């Protein structure tokens, strides 16, 4: 709605949109469609080894015909939190609209659209324990976004169709609960996250933490485990009752390495050995201890069977 709507509403000014190479496919595929239809030209910004977008790279990419910059608040795979406030300030100075995909961030870290210079923001309920299939969009007053679904005047004439009232109320209530407990939840999840990271790095040799170690969501951990493929790890963890993934949920059926990790300069081999674990405020210390008990022998067993694992092991 936002990407297509802005492209349509501001086409007289231009058609140039700026984003990053590590965005969610909801952004990347929509922009690719706009490009294919000749409705937009898109600049895809590089990121550094931690997945961070440089605000100065955004500034350098802005042209007279630039109408929108879209950079996610935090990455869904590696948990890196982007310098959204600084990027928003660059956009504000240049007179360019700024959209952020805040799906991973809302309910997990503090956010303020005014302080962070955000014009457009999207979120979804299931990321903070709300109902699935329900989302919301913030549109700053004065920003033009035409309806992409027409036929009625619902939702301030932005999206036609009978409203899903239980879903809307469920989203609002879940966000209310999450916001009230945000500080305590962040403190708890950060402590558990750091314990998991330290424990894995201590117990498993040749493991790499993907994403920024400090500018990171409190509930995200992503490891690169060399010499084995993540699918094998996931199968064995599943047998032990541990839910994990190798990338985003939306690409769980694909065997291709993560576009996020590749954009961060990680090799295909290491990207194929990525392991993502997501915590919540309901995660317990006992569960972290269980993962630290189960994961190292699984990794060693798989490495012992791997033809690329060095004989004699690794330090």
Show where each model-derived region lies:
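Pyridoxal 5′-phosphate
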Residues: 1-315
């Amino acid at each position: 709605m936002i990407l297509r709507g802005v492209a349509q509403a501001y086409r007289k000014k231009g058609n140039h949109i700026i984003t990053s190479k590590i965005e969610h496919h909801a952004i990347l595929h929509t922009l690719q469609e706009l490009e294919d239809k000749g409705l937009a030209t898109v600049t895809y910004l590089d990121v550094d080894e931690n997945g961070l977008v440089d605000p100065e790279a955004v500034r350098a990419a802005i042209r007279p015909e630039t109408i929108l910059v879209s950079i996610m608040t935090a990455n869904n795979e590696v948990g890196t939190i982007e310098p959204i406030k600084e990027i928003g300030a660059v956009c504000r100075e240049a007179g360019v609209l700024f959209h952020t995909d805040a799906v991973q961030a809302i309910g997990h870290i503090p956010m303020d659209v005014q302080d962070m210079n955000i014009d457009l923001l999207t979120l979804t309920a299931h990321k903070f324990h709300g109902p699935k299939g329900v989302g919301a969009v913030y549109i700053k007053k004065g920003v033009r976004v035409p309806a992409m679904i027409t036929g009625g005047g619902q939702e301030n004439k932005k999206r036609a169709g009978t409203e899903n009232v239980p879903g809307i109320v469920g989203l609002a209530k879940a966000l209310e609960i999450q916001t009230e407990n945000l500080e305590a939840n962040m403190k708890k999840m950060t402590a558990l996250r750091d314990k998991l990271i330290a424990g894995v790095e201590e117990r498993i040799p040749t493991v790499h933490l993907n994403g920024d170690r400090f500018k990171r969501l409190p509930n995200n951990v992503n490891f690169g485990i060399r010499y084995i493929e993540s699918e094998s790890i996931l199968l064995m963890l599943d047998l032990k009752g541990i839910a994990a993934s190798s990338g985003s949920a939306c690409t769980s059926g694909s065997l291709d390495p993560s576009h996020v990790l590749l954009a961060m300069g990680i090799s295909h081999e290491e990207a194929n050995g990525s392991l993502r674990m997501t915590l919540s405020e309901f995660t317990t210390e006992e569960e972290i201890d269980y993962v630290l008990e189960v994961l190292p022998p699984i990794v060693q067993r798989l490495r012992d069977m791997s033809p690329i694992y060095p004989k004699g092991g690794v330090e």
